[in-house]
Amino acid sequence: MANFISFFILFSALFFLFKRLFFPNRKQKLPPGPPSLPIVGHLHHIKTSLYQALARLSNEYGPVIFLRFGCRSFVAVSSPSAIEECFTKNDIIFANRPKSMATDRLTFNYIGFAWAPYGQFWRIVRRFTVVEFFSTNCLGKSRPIREEEIQSILRSIFKITKMKSEKIDLKHWVSVFTFNVLMRTMADKWAVDEEDSGVEKGKEIMKELREIFFTNVAMNVCDFFPIFRWFGYKGIEQRMINLHNRRNEFLQGLVDKVRINKKSGFVRNKESHRSLIEAFLSHQDQDPEFFTDDLIKSVLLIMFVAGTETSAVIIEWAMSLLLSNPDVLNKLRIEIDKQIGNKRLINESDIPKLPYLRCIINETMRLFPPVPLLLPHCSSEDCKIAGYDIPKGTVLFVNAWATHRDPKLWDEPEKFIPERFENMEVEKEGYKFIPFGIGRRACPGTSMGIRTVSLALGAFIQCFDWKKVEEYELNTSYDYRITLQKANQLEASCSPRQDFFPILSQL
């Protein structure tokens, strides 16, 4: 009997998929796409990273393409006009996120603002987070934390290189910097203490943090063929449950620590930064049913995933590109020396006076957007894009990678040319440059991210001389997990600039 039921379920699922794939609603005018196969749909066309495969298919079939992966329907867009239509006329329709096995298990039941359904709850949580963490006032109060943490990294690198030029694992140091900045602003503690940051203990801590927060949790075969999920295919879901338990334990520990400090009667100077957890707990006292610990943990999770590795990746790619383009590096150094001199370190108030630095960051994000496929959206009702019918429940992919490298939009798109941004008002360029997303679900932390990246990159170029390690092949190959990372971590030979010995010695 059990075998019959299993066979019946499998037969029904296959029949349903076959019907959807080969007998769609003939009245619908779906976007073009490649030939499909029974059951699997278009999965056989995805032989590289998804963003690269979609870019290749878009070159062949146009900037709006329709795909089916098993039982799920997808539309991928890569032209500014199609992207604009998605997030203006259809903005509310695409304001939701798709559900998947990963989001079922890893988002605290969809209550964080990145994955919560569009509506009043989402608006309240997002608005609260923006006001308490990303507002101009809050960024001003947290500025000392970012400046102290970059000084800590400079101090650590100087200790290693002050006697002679040494090889530096730059990815490690920028990751320590971004994690410590986020940890201090959210939880009033360090991820890695300075004395541990350059030794094995610090490296083990960073390895554990990456395992907790950056395990690949994209859609998988169980999302396309739900029958595999019922049978626990390859233990994928159980591994996600185990990962969630690790995350939950870590994040709950942060919340409990701040709660204990708060109950101890600690009084903060009104002008100093208040941690995000402390802000949430203050509101939890007034409305415990809304501001639950799970809500706090869900927001912390989003911050760690979206705010640490993305910034670190941008810094690492920028340094890699600068080492490959020494003329650009020298031009940036001249700008920094002219505006700041050699008597003090760069600080955040200097950033608006360094336009070429911002051009370099923009060009880095154009070539290597930290998230090449923006977080997916899902249509809440039938709609149209570029005259094509998009059914309700279709998952939307916005391919920033393809848009940023489109030769119709950019001259010599494969080349690193920061000067292309010198006379460009990015805000007026429409939808051709979208490294932080677009629409109602755009990243609220753009300003903080730019400050963090600008400060670190400016300080590295101001204080140290950098050279490519001879035996290290400086290439631009990449590895796509949650973010677009370098396939090989950047190692560079580093030595303090002679004029900055006095300043670095006094840090």
UniProtKB/Swiss-Prot annotation:
Identification of the protein by name: Cytochrome P450 81C13
Signal peptide: 1-22
Residue positions the entry lists as glycosylated: 347, 362, 475
Annotated family: Belongs to the cytochrome P450 family.
Domain of life per record: Eukaryota
UniProt-recorded Gene Ontology molecular function terms: heme binding; iron ion binding; monooxygenase activity; oxidoreductase activity, acting on paired donors, with incorporation or reduction of molecular oxygen
Annotated positions binding heme: 443
Organism: Catharanthus roseus
This protein's UniProt keywords: Glycoprotein, Heme, Iron, Metal-binding, Monooxygenase, Oxidoreductase, Signal
Enzyme Commission number(s): 1.14.-.-
Pfam families: p450
